[in-house]
Amino acid sequence: MSTSTNPERAQRLSGQSSTAEFRKHTGSDEELIRTLHKLDGRSYPAYKSVVGMWDFGSFSLSIDRIQADPYAPPSKVRAISTPQEMGLPQAAIASPDARAACADYLLRAFNRSLRERRLHDIQVMSPSVEILDRSACTVKPDRVELRFEVRMPARGRTILGHRAAQIFDLDVPDAVQDTFDYLSDIPEVEREREGLLRHIAVYEDYRTLQQILIDRGWVSFIANGSVLARRSGVSQSPMEGALPFASPATLEAEVELPHAGVLRGMAIEPGVTVIVGGGYHGKSTLLGAIQRGVYAHIPGDGREYVATLEDAMKVRAADGRAVTGVDVSSFITHLPGNADTTRFSTENASGSTSQAASLVESIQLGSTLLLIDEDTSATNLMIRDARMRELVQAEKEPITPLVDRISSLHKDLGVSTILVMGGSGDYLDQADRVLMMDHYRCLDVSDRARQVIEELPRVHQNLTMSAPLARRTPARLHSSDRPKTKAAGLSSITIDKINLDLGDVEQIVDPGQTEAIAWMLRGLLYSYANGTSSLTDLLARLERTLNSEGLDAVVKFGAHGLPGRLARPRLVDVAAALNRFRGLRLSEEEPSSTTKD
């Protein structure tokens, strides 16, 4: 530990001005430790005297907020350094992609240090297997910042100053040095350096692969050798002994990546792709890998070289969700009561209306790839066989199934679809290609499917899919006297007294995304909305703000201080949350339907 005091450096790294009740200090690590010892036995609020910036030599430690009492959320702390002081390789800061991957790796390294050292008084955001932009760690060309929390020890409300001194004299510096030290000439540091460079290489390869999708007009690519199966339904760890993916020869393509070099794998072209196969043979596993391919994955995950268009949207039924002013007329018409389905609203959507709304909302937001699994879909929205068409005449059936619109969806609107169908062959007529999963082996059975179509023809319709009519313009909402913004897990949000369930938005993969979405919803509806800007305009404004200010932009929406547990969500997922929010109101909203079919 350094014993030097460098006030100018500490002030430069702090990024914050002085605040109030207790003066913010600029002092050495030794001064901090002495102060904590002196606080032993005092009442808990005296801990606030250590708020400030402290120089630990190779890094500065900023104690930004002290918890109100021993049972409150823990105190907020930042470790701040520079890439040069840390000895980071130049490759780690050479580009925005490299810096993003570096930040992700450093956060994982800090988590690992806390676990291995069993430092339970120090907490930090625990990342998922996806490489995301997270507020817990940021890397810039001249600054590295790590945000975490420390539970300040006490007996009752009496400060345990000697224990606190130990935490800041040993535990915090040890964990930070484990994370920040790339200068030491020891095997452990060399392994970390190699791991960091590997992490960056995998992320840069993934970003290149996503650009290749755009350049070549593909919607997804799965490299040969990828491990798609997961250990269990509640684990994202790869299944041990799983059969590596191998592309059908007819769909195999070659890509060249900057680090991995030449890879071969399955390239999925635009249009309608149907995945078939027996139960438990890997259909949903393949679709699951494709839907998570909108994110980069860490080395060793097995899906490092699986990439999907980043605006791809998994669409499913969600009984009971709210729908506000959505044009579902391509799928739902002449409802009982003559409700206007060009501007459909309900507080309690059925399976079919909820999925129809999700389809249309995704299209309106510019998604060019829809992902659908029959297991989580409304059957009456997906198919309607000949017998049912004969029994229930068209004029008595308000639902037009997706199978009648899916070809037009691509030809007229440029929206591709990948769907899993194991129980109905109705989509074979519409498919541009048919994949079969057989004991986790992927086969191209498009030719055989065409033979089946000829042998067993079905009467079907190819109806035109029109672009949604409604221009949706959110009205500004007004907050309660005691505003509340809360998120929990992957799917639960509360804004004031309104609860929001995002369980059907399957591509939210990190609790930090859910928390970020909660604050972004408050910003969109309580700050940005003005009754004249469309939903897409509001989202574009939000994206510009995030690009220029980062995740800290949510502070202007009411988030406290320097948030350390946020992960950046995709804009389409923010929009999906907004579309499900029961408080959403549209400007000049027309009378709505509350019908549930």
Please place each PLM-identified region on the residue numbering:
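Glycine-rich phosphate-binding P-loop
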Residues: L263-R292
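Post-Walker A helix-loop "phosphate-sensing" segment adjacent to the P-loop in P-loop NTPases
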Residues: R292-R303
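Conserved NTP phosphate-binding and transfer environment spanning the P-loop NTPase/kinase superfamily
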Residues: K411-G414, V420-D597
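Flexible beta-alpha connector loops of hexameric P-loop NTPases
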Residues: L160, R321, F331-S352, R384-I399
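N-terminal accessory targeting/assembly segments
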Residues: M1-G217, L228, L578, S587-D597
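Conserved alpha-helical scaffold flanking the Walker A/P-loop in AAA+ ATPase domains
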Residues: S350-S362
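Conserved P-loop NTPase nucleotide-binding/switch module
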Residues: S362-I406, H410-K411, V420-D429, R433-R450
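N-terminal pre-Walker A segment at the start of P-loop NTPase domains
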Residues: A229-R264, L309-A312, R316-V323, S329-F331, ...
